[in-house]
Amino acid sequence: MALLQIAEPGQSAAPHEHRLAVGIDLGTTNSLVAAVRSGEALTLADSEGRHSLPSVVHYGVDSTLVGHDAEALSALFPAQTLVSVKRFMGKSLSDIQAGMQEFPYEFSVSEQGLPLFVMPQGAVNPIQASADILRPLIERAEKTLGGQLQGVVITVPAYFDDAQRQGTKDAAELLGVKVLRLLNEPTAAAIAYGLDSKQEGVIAVYDLGGGTFDISVLRLSGGVFEVLATGGNSALGGDDFDHLLQQHLQAAWGLTSASAQLSRQLLIEARRVKEALTDNDTVTAHVSLDGSDLSLEISKADFEALIATLVKKTISSCRRTLRDAGISTDEVIETVMVGGSTRVPLVRQQVEQFFNKTPLTSIDPDRVVAIGAAIQADILVGNKPDSDLLLLDVIPLSLGIETMGGLVEKVIPRNTTIPVARAQEFTTFKDGQTAMAFHVVQGERELVDDCRSLARFTLTDIPALAAGAAHIRVTFQVDADGLLSVTAMEKSTGVNTSIQVKPSFGLSDLEIATMLKDSMKHAKDDISLRMLTEQKVEAMRVIESLQAALNNDGDLLELSERESLQAALANLGEIAKGNDRDAIEQAIKALDDKTQDFASLRMDNSIKAALKGQSIDNI
């Protein structure tokens, strides 16, 4: 597997080979597939030049139709034609029971309690239906790119839970396709605009699709996108604009009742008029009915009056979501527009007015999510130019933590495949220590000063025990996106704290290569220095431990014995200031030999204290 081959930074194991990977926007209404070709991310068209594929599946007795062909049959065979399958992903039958009457389908239930659609070919679950939508997109990509895909990145709404995400992944794996990553749709849109590597701050992603509206508030910091809040309306989208215009035409022409065929004809014309009004002040609607031609001039003002209430609802959702995130509009540095319905001028005007800044619209809003997914897929599969964002499926440099003496304890070694989790236990250095500071570093050198600092945090409320008695478990976890979470937990109380950081942020291939070369160049000196430092730390521990023992139980010794130990302590302290490792080691051993009798006296004294007042029968 190419991603797991170890090569020097900036070099693939087979530099001449371009690996094929795509990004897929698996949408509620439409789906798209995109790829990076000649350095540019583009959506891929079908044989008829169409980029979007309607997310519709028709199940006939002997055949399954997907996309445009299925959509054409949706009015005639609604019970056999699945639309908006994404709404059912990861849901149990009980989850959708309240709204089942809204759907024309016959439902049954699986052994796991999941909804099944009863079709002429048999029962179909949402995962299988999603796989049927993905299939023509995968086939289109492999035909266009001329080879088998090595992986895909599929986008999902930011609010999808684990079950919905797993269902999406399972749909691709039913087709034998490797899912490199599931990517949040708003994050994909931000990546398409290059916001992941250029800025830090709060980004709002306004996504008005055909059937749903989503608003996501993201914080970008250190190359990491954090979803602060999401909101929206799952029953509001561009289709509602079409229906309002359809009803307006129907009323204007006096069509009090309309057949399914006429309703569809009116809806298609309403959609055409809506799209034409984006660039025109007036458009004439035309419909042929029983040999008669009906026409009506629609102005942009007419259309905006029809949809104004719906647009205001989306702005209200934006206001609520910002409030949930604890963010003001002044803190939003960019607004990204996603979804074909954001082309409507009134929508753009209202969004600009609310956020008080011009939204990003230069990338086709229908395609921006797929394009961002394609950029991510190209990086993950290994086609990364030196100038691109560093995102590897192995850890390029070791991750570790600072220990006493400024030494580095490596927790996750370089070239470990991700995702990964590793843990180590540490303990307190001094008696009564109730807090511990952690310094997370990255690099191959033995000393902290020679490594890259990533983060610092402190664990407090550690029980006040003797040095070495408290046990703190430190867990390093790197997820599939390269995001490092470090958690420190005191085992007896469960008190814990954590921090997140992206080790790859701001780190170029050249810097990685330099750090690796330095580690090899200085390896011998670093090891010697580490061994010396470890002896100095041990000397410090012995000195502090013995000094505390003398303070507590020094009266157990004769004066001459106490003076002898104090002299040995001073001697070790003086030798530890130097750089002779062997001399420090010998001084520690000499002091250890001198304290044997004192240790026995302390042990006897502790036993006597414990047994004082106890009868033989109780022992």
Swiss-Prot record:
Q: Name one GO molecular function term.
A: unfolded protein binding
- Coiled coil residues, start to end: none
Give a GO biological-process term.
iron-sulfur cluster assembly
Print the keywords alphabetically: ATP-binding, Chaperone, Nucleotide-binding
Q: Which domain of life is it from?
A: Bacteria
Instruction: Check the record and name the InterPro entries matching this protein.
Output: ATPase_NBD (IPR043129), Heat_shock_70_CS (IPR018181), HSP70_C_sf (IPR029048), HSP70_peptide-bd_sf (IPR029047), Hsp_70_fam (IPR013126), ISC_FeS_clus_asmbl_HscA (IPR010236)
Indicate yes or no for the key word Nucleotide-binding. yes
Does Nucleus show up as a keyword for this record?
A: no
**SUPFAM superfamilies in the record:** Actin-like ATPase domain, Heat shock protein 70kD (HSP70), C-terminal subdomain, Heat shock protein 70kD (HSP70), peptide-binding domain
Functional summary from the UniProt entry: Chaperone involved in the maturation of iron-sulfur cluster-containing proteins. Has a low intrinsic ATPase activity which is markedly stimulated by HscB.
Family assignment?
Belongs to the heat shock protein 70 family.
Q: Which NCBIfam families match?
A: HscA, PRK05183.1
Q: PANTHER family, from UniProt? A: HEAT SHOCK PROTEIN 70KDA
Name of protein:
Chaperone protein HscA homolog
What is the organism field in this record?
A: Shewanella denitrificans (strain OS217 / ATCC BAA-1090 / DSM 15013)
Gene encoding the protein: hscA
